[in-house]
């Protein structure tokens, strides 16, 4: 067994994903999810060596109790494995401009994450709860923070500054930050290996497609533009998020239709996207089923989703100058051969030609090139953010 194991924690507002990852291979020794925090039926599910387990956490429990269960029940039952854990790695959604790389957590870092909470009010406070719970449960282990925004700190000003009064950036930090950076970092690195090119000479466009979705232009291993902005709302059509729209729509909804700002925020984040257009579901699998059955709303939602994505991919050839490959990842990107084919068919001007057999084969965790031999390359690479977090954690504690 490797002596480079890391416990990776990803704390949401009402859930906690966890895994024990081998930083050398990326394999998970344990993985699980605690959910429904604050409710009567808080539960935890986990898998060890392929064997599934489930338990109640008790009514109205939360992150602290979940971490204690992981320590006292799950890891206590695997003492040999637990003894090999070298660090706890935390996924942090927003590091603002304060954090350009992963860091070992101390009080200064905790304060910095707190100061970025206004930029990610649903996520950063939950991450802080998880950090404090982990410190209490693992007082002797180093804790490491890995930021979703850090990868995008290499963007030039022309990509991240909004055309608003500059003082809003200077005084309040209002700018494009981007998300999914850990995923885009991983798949762009893996894409260079598939292409058999040095990372420094590889230009790819990565599409991380899930309930949240973003596109990033990666030039020589560095992010040079990305579709999400100050928050995860900007950019692509998503499961329940609207993505790009005319900002005056907000004014119209408030002053002409009587919405409150809170209602508009909720509408754009939780009632829009695939769900809002289809009036059916936010789940892409349900959208594809509706499309196959001829459901008008599902068909329109799918077409808009693919069209917006294709436009972004096309536009990101501008900062790259030369395109080596388009990479699909995330739950939708890895599994929807329908969406991949539709998007690439819209991009035939760039000489994309889908190989139907390869495209259908690249699903359920299988990676590979999905275009014909004479085509510009498009590929599927399953993301592994936990591996990046584990790798960064080991690198930092062994410096």
UniProtKB/Swiss-Prot annotation:
Subcellular location, record wording: Cytoplasm
EC class (word): transferase
CDD domains in UniProt: ASKHA_NBD_AcK_PK
Active-site annotation: 148
Keyword presence, Metal-binding: yes
Annotated GO MF terms: acetate kinase activity; ATP binding; magnesium ion binding
Enzymatic reactions: acetate + ATP = acetyl phosphate + ADP
Coiled-coil intervals, chain numbering: none
Superkingdom: Bacteria
UniProt keyword ATP-binding present: yes
Cofactor requirement: Mg(2+); Mn(2+)
Site keyed Transition state stabilizer: positions: 180, 241
Binding sites annotated in the UniProt record for substrate: 91
Single GO biological process annotation from the record: acetyl-CoA biosynthetic process
A cellular component term, taken from the record's GO annotations: cytosol
Binding site for ATP: 17, 208-212, 283-285, 331-335
Binding site for Mg(2+): 10, 385
Pathway: Metabolic intermediate biosynthesis; acetyl-CoA biosynthesis; acetyl-CoA from acetate: step 1/2
Protein function: Catalyzes the formation of acetyl phosphate from acetate and ATP. Can also catalyze the reverse reaction.
NCBIfam families cross-referenced by the UniProt entry: ackA
Protein family according to the UniProt entry: Belongs to the acetokinase family.
Protein name, UniProt field: Acetate kinase
Gene name of the encoded protein: ackA
